[in-house]
Swiss-Prot record:
HAMAP family: UPF0314. It comes from the Bacteria. GO terms for cellular component: plasma membrane. Belongs to the UPF0314 family. Keywords: Cell membrane, Membrane, Transmembrane, Transmembrane helix. Pfam families: DUF2585. This is UPF0314 protein Rleg2_3744. It is a multi-pass membrane protein. The chain crosses the membrane at residues 15-35, 64-84, 127-147, 150-170. The lineage of its organism: Bacteria, Pseudomonadati, Pseudomonadota, Alphaproteobacteria, Hyphomicrobiales. Its main location: membrane. It is found in: Cell membrane.
Length: 195
């Protein structure tokens, strides 16, 4: 590879990464304009919020739903690998960020907040803080980068472990969250309420 080719490649990758950063910034600004709180209304920021049905859930840097966002990264890397096979990694990341940021905006809209409150055990859910939502997107990116480097079998094993572990500890995980959002099952809701 010539010096000119190397310079072009660096410039090209830089473009994609700047575009990725722009998507995250657009997510944050949009959530601010939607009236989301920047940080927990409690006035402080915690590295980890271990309560599930607490006012601090979805308000701090990480929580029991962080593994779900890491799994999003695994899945979105796989999608990018399939549909953008010849594109650079940063282009695949941009696709992942569009999907994750789009979900974060939808998740924090009145439509989905109300759906969570009526169809799931999240009766006190009022949406994510901007900080938590941005960190959900960052954790998705971490999952994406992990999946881009790790063997597929290891990535799948970690995803299964996350699902089983969070399902056991808090009776919720990515799979149950999707099921309860799209097609609520009363028996699952009752089981989840036993936490």
């Amino acid at each position: 590879m010539s010096a000119a080719d190397a310079e072009y490649r660096v410039r090209h990758q830089s473009f994609w990464f700047v575009a990725c950063l722009a998507v995250l910034v657009a997510q944050i600004v949009t959530e601010y304009l939607m009236g989301r709180v920047p940080i927990c209304a409690c006035g402080y920021v915690k590295l980890w919020e271990g309560g599930v049905n607490t006012s601090g859930n979805s308000q701090h840097l990480s929580d029991w739903y962080t593994p779900s966002h890491i799994i999003h990264g695994f899945l979105f890397y796989g999608l990018g690998h399939l549909v953008l096979r010849r594109k650079p990694l940063a282009a695949k990341l941009l696709l992942a960020l569009f999907i994750e940021s789009g979900w974060e905006l939808l998740e924090n809209s009145p439509l989905i907040i109300d759906r969570y409150r009526t169809a799931t055990i999240a009766l006190d859910y009022y949406g994510d803080s901007i900080l938590n939502s941005a960190m959900d997107t960052v954790f998705m990116c971490l999952g994406f980068f992990f999946a881009s480097r790790a063997p597929v079998a290891l990535t799948v094993a970690i995803a299964i472990f996350f699902e089983i572990f969070t399902g056991y500890v808090i009776r919720d995980n990515l799979t149950l969250n999707v099921v309860m959002l799209i097609w609520p099952v009363e028996a699952i809701k009752v089981w989840q309420g036993g936490v």
